[in-house]
Amino acid sequence: VPESAPAAPAAPEAEQPLGEPADPALVSIEGLSVHYLGRESWVLDSVSLTHLRAQVTAIIGPSGCGKTTLVRALCGLIPHCLPSEYAGSLRLSGTEVADATVQTLAQTVAYVGQSPDAAVVTRTVHNDVAFPLQNLCLPRSEITARVEEALRAVGLIERIWDDPWTLSGGQRQRLALAVALAMRPQLLVLDEPTSAIDATGREDFYALISSLTASGTAVVVIDHDLDPVLPIIDQVLALNADGRTIAVGSPREVFMSHRRELIDAGVWMPRALREADDDLFLGAAAPEVALTCAEAGIRVPRLADLCAHNEVRYLEKQVRDSAESWQRVEAIDTREVVAGRPRPEARTSVELVDLEVPGRAPRVSLRLGGGEFVALVGPNGAGKSSILSALAGLVRSRADKATVCGRDVGKGRHLVGYVFQNPEHQFVATTVGAELAVGGTSLERVDELLEQFHLTAHRGHHPLTLSGGQARRLSVATMVSEERDVIVLDEPTYGQDWDNTCELMDFIDQLRDQGRTVIMATHDLELALEHCTHIVALPGAPRGGTVPLPEQEAGVGDDADEPSGVPATGVATPRAGDLDLMPVPPRPQPRRGLFTSLNPFTLFASVLPVMVMVFALRNHHLNLGILLAASVLIVAARASLRRTVASVVAPWVVTALMTWIFSSGVHHQETAVRLYDLGDAVTGGTGIGALIALVLVSGVSTDPGALIRTLTTTFRMPYRLGAAGTAAIAFITRFHDDFVLLRTARALRGVGGRWGLLAPVVRWTGSILPLMILAIQHAERVALSMDSRAFGAHKRRTEMTDAPWRARDWSVVVLTWVLVAITWKTLH
């Protein structure tokens, strides 16, 4: 057996970063257009841009205009990873991107994509951040330091050893940011990097970006809401719906001189300009117009204005003399009074008394009579999505009382229209038009919804082929088409441009006018304060979430000044000082058992000859002895109780079942069927049970990730295969959860209802094809994430742990093989 591989292999002579450092033009784009192979049309229309070192450039434009395509080209994903080609010129420090190598691109550019789920490529938060650094062959000590530094910067240091799939969507987005920060690139490319992050986290993130630019890092960012980053933006590239350049220049030049064109294109304007009179942008007055919130004296609402640290807060919008204000209330109860006016008759659409999702969401109480628009706000991980899932019957919850339209809430009881955080999970039909027709919606109504949500051109397309923004609009339209009295929306404005967001809010107003109740989870506090009737503000997450600041709890300091009508409380994301004081949690240690000190491959090497012996000797006494010995070894391995019991019981159950099947089958010699040649019924049944027991012995205490590391370090398997295997293992949890969500979505939509007891079977089979499509799409996104993280930059990589082959491993293997030889000679 070869010796363990060195921890940090010497990298091949590193290629110099692209171009000469003295060249101030880090990015030079001339006449860029992109063609995805297999499509007729081109994306982008001869876009040109020059981006200097340490400069911040924002790319803005309506949904679908090609912003993501442009930044993918900047990272080299186009044309190196995606089947595509480009016309024009795209240079990084003077080197054409099409001619650059993986190594040079990885050392120059770090990319954060739109989907936080695609950022998960390993099984722990630590390993995800370490992944690109290992690929770049950095020393272990430097990798450890960078990982901890990056996780502190994004507020995830307490979750360092957690499974990324246990994080909320916003926390996974923070994780993706940490990966990019750890790479310390010359150019940081951010594609809507804060779309799933809470308001305080967004503010902290852009403060971090400001410090990076001060140290020389260049940044290209796509974000609909530029206000948090506007003070540090050097130039803006504005595109129209066709991917053609509207303007390139300083923020003031672009937003002031092209305001009307940007508004017509559906671009989010800075807050200071949204209500400004067009006359202000003419003549000499234009340079004096405020552009940033600071210049205009606008205070953007913060989580600290709404949320407490340890209790749920309820706020209600009150209207007096046409003036709106927000007031904190002890409870939300609109059964008899709504918007300050008595109802014609008392009614109840939603009644929640101390509803909670244990371990995931705090207790919430609401009594709604219909026609409300309620926002759930709070930090990442506070439980917003969990509460909506409980209302929709997707997760278990408990409450003193929980009803929707008089019917009890519970898992499996789908009483509300639910718009998933990931819209792809809720689609049940093969075309956009058919999706809206589920539930018997008339063709006329389908046409209206297609027009209203700008999906007419996509009527015959499969829902899973839509862009992110289009899929989000379709997900909302499907719930509207079903005429539910209560609709819950999980981040419905995520990825939407200004026009689509405004249209969605107008449509929700129409639903309210019909007496329907809308409950929305959102990170957009300004949206909630402007459009909602009530707000439920959740406290910070119990772990890895938020900590109170003393000056806020005392009612003084920067957050003491509150917006009109909004009570100040005291919750904030940990600041740098707090994070620096947080110790790094120790790495969880596996339970000590009989095999803990062995190399993960030792047991596999030991049981192989035993398996051969079972096949060759066909002796039921031997098989029973192996079953008994395996049961003892499984107990000695000291895995979790559940895993131990299952691993001990399963082989014996299989043995009994197979013995019964073989013995009660057809006895006529001419039609007898045997599996290979394991002998009679008892020998065959015990043989199969023994083989299963041996497999379980070798795997009951072995972590799959540790086995892969052993193969790549001790046995020199190409690390690319190992990394792909690790990513596949990490995806297993997501794969299972997706399958559950797809089946649940079909239950929510009433699919299979007419089949009665067979409905679960119909939903199960109907979910297989969408699951395959989602799996392929997710695999493609993960592959892009891996490619953007220096995957394949070198032939070797740094391994963070050793898996040496010791004398004890030789002893166990040799002893087992000797015992097999003796037994074979005795029984043969």
Regions found by a protein language model. Give the residues of each.
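Conserved beta-strand-loop-alpha-helix hinge in the C-terminal portion
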Residues: 243-273, 541-576
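H-loop/switch region of ABC-family ATPase nucleotide-binding domains
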Residues: 223-224, 522-523
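Conserved ABC ATPase "signature" region
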Residues: 142-159, 443-458
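ABC ATPase C-loop
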Residues: 180-181, 479-480
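Catalytic Walker B motif of ABC-type/P-loop ATPase nucleotide-binding domains
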Residues: 188-191, 487-491
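Helix-to-loop junction immediately C-terminal to a conserved catalytic motif
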Residues: 75, 392
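Conserved ABC ATPase signature
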Residues: 163-167, 171, 462-466
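Transmembrane alpha-helix interface motif
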Residues: 580-622, 626-628, 741-828
